[in-house]
Amino acid sequence: MSENKCPVMHGSATTTENSMANMNWWPKSLSLDILHQHDHKTNPMAADFNYQDEVKKLDFVALKNDLHALMTDSQAWWPADWGHYGGLMIRLTWHAAGTYRIADGRGGAGHGSQRFAPLNSWPDNGNLDKARRLLWPIKKKYGNKLSWADLIAYAGTIAYESMGLKTFGFAFGREDIWHPEKDIYWGAEKDWLLPTDNDNSRYSGERNLENPLAAVMMGLIYVNPEGVDGKPDPLKTAQDIRETFARMAMNDEETVALTAGGHTVGKAHGNGNADLLGPEPEDADIHDQGFGWLNKAKRGIGRDTVTSGIEGAWTTHPTQWDNGYFTMLLNHEWELCKSPAGAWQWQPINIKEEDKPRDVEDPSISTMPMMTDADMAMKMDPEYRKISEHFHRDPEYFSKVFSRAWFKLTHRDMGPKVRYLGPDVPVEDLLWQDPVPTGPKDFNVAVVKKAIKETGLSISDMVTTAWDSARTFRGSDKRGGANGARIRLALQKQWAGNEPKRLASVLSVLEPIAASHGVSVADVIVLAGNLGIELAAKKAGFDVTVPFISGRGDATDEMTDNESFAVLEPLHDGYRNWLKQDFAVSAEELMLDRTQLMGLTAHEMTVLVGGMRVIGTNYAETGHGVFTERKGALTNDFFVNLTDMNYIWKPIGQNEYEICERETGKRKWTASRVDLIFGSNSVLRSYAEVYAQDDNKQKFVNDFISAWTKMMNADRFDVS
């Protein structure tokens, strides 16, 4: 008998090195993993744990005092530069929040995801593991009342306060996740920091960055600080900066403020040989305990630290908030040089001794300041230069703009202001928060519903309009949704996916009802959709009441940043069987991505698609996927006929199929890829079979209503 190599009978591979998962065998199959991430089985907290309730018990004053004390409590295992951890903590917060991109709302500081791969091991996040370990005693002390996500975001804000900046405010309420995010596309590259011309480049054409990406390279948060592809050229770097920050929803003034404010304090580290650094946290030895980038061949701390490879401080006084960044940048001429680690950077020509920053360990030693290629862009690019000179002339204005931009950076993915918690929430409503006024709550729902019913609007029109209003919701950054009824405003009512003519006709009926009954249009739209579902269920033989929560408000054009909202325009909607155009990505993959953003599960997606097909909500009333003889009734016919082996499916064009009777060949229905995926994909078929069962007709209706209600209330953060 041969000796076994491993004494453990694994159910599956427990490391990725030698595993062959289903996706390796069948790479073209549709993976539903992004819909099942952050399952309760990964969460160590009790099922009834509510972080929003728990954080309200936090001693906010004590926490702030503890963080202030931490800033100057230098630890021998990772000493603070100049005795102050401010620069390190600001970088920690920056690099957590800075992953946000407006295109899909993913990334950002909202979930504490920097604790996990890949972010914890990105080259650009070098040595931020040290910052999190420095924060651990505080996290340990405050426990469940303080999430890692809130602590990481708060640390940088307090760091600025401790160095003299009057901050704009701070809000708590970010809830931790417990394993890496699966839904975020960081790029197709297989290696870190590859130049533009790599085989899996994120650029096309002259320099067109792939959507939804914002960073210029795999493993970077923003741009390459040494220059485009590591080649110094401030004007070219300025183009990258402008594109990257725009994709983070920042304008030129905010970009200059954030760049300058981020580099007013702290320093970059490159005083040594980067080749001597150990592996990143995810690849570190087990005895390193998640500590990465260890310099085991040298002292590797203090003045000998190597992180980015760039070496030096930007300002004369790197532990105080002042206008020194612009003084240093604009009052000197600069020349290219290389750091001790071999990185490109810029150094001032003929700088006075008194203008040099001190050594991080010995104040009697002066050091040469530096600027990155990105900093030089603030001087060389004409528009950035104007803003920089304005900030230099008016330090108070610079501080004001920066503090607001910092607040925006650290809160952009938190959603509406109603989600903000804590004593330092700013009173002012900001346009980028997508404000929505509170709507009337106390009205007779039955009377309004009766008025809607008497209009004679079709089931399809009522359900479709409510769906189109709600489907803009993104769980990633908590934007969009039915609250606010922005579907009736100038921008959204012209979106192709909203069928402008049909929408205008429906709104012309619903808006007078809202006005005459003193309720919001937002509530009337949702209530009409609910009524449509109830009528469709009645046609199928079920008397149901769709749950309704009043209180939605109506936003105005003045409350809406059209440029920011433009990214919410649907370019596809598998639920309504619609593509604005043909895309390189398959229709079913697009539906999966949209489903994840809306916060739905795979079985919720399944039941909603099946129900909406038979109700008749397809875009432009196309017949694809309407597998029923009882259109308008909420039946399980879609699933019954999809799983019926009396039919055969044939492609007749791109994303178009016909369903024929197997024996006669007679054409019965037509379908899209989105329809057929529920019979083709083995997991989705298993759900389809559940809803096709003879004993699950009531379950189908109940589950549809549950998923529908979830969507209608997805953005109701004002209710529990």
Curated annotation (Swiss-Prot):
Keyword Iron attributed = yes
Report quaternary structure and partners: Homodimer or homotetramer.
Q: Which residues bind heme b?
A: H263
Write down the top EC class of this protein.
oxidoreductase
Q: Which organism is it from?
A: Shewanella denitrificans (strain OS217 / ATCC BAA-1090 / DSM 15013)
Entry protein name: Catalase-peroxidase
Q: Name one GO cellular component term.
A: cytosol
Family per UniProt?
Answer: Belongs to the peroxidase family. Peroxidase/catalase subfamily.
Disulphide bonds annotated for this chain are none
Q: Which NCBIfam families match?
A: cat_per_HPI, PRK15061.1
Tell me the residues linked by Tryptophyl-tyrosyl-methioninium (Tyr-Met) (with W-94): Y222-M248
Cross-link Tryptophyl-tyrosyl-methioninium (Trp-Tyr) (with M-248) residue location(s): W94-Y222
Signal peptide (from-to): 1-21
Q: Give the free-text PTM comment from the record.
A: Formation of the three residue Trp-Tyr-Met cross-link is important for the catalase, but not the peroxidase activity of the enzyme.
Which superkingdom heads the taxonomic lineage of this protein's source?
Answer: Bacteria
Q: Cofactor note from UniProt? A: Binds 1 heme b (iron(II)-protoporphyrin IX) group per dimer.
The entry lists its GO molecular-function terms as: catalase activity; heme binding; metal ion binding
Q: Which InterPro entries match?
A: Catalase_peroxidase, Haem_peroxidase, Haem_peroxidase_sf, Peroxidases_AS
This protein's cofactor list reads: heme b
Against CDD domains, the record matches this protein to: catalase_peroxidase_1 (cd00649)
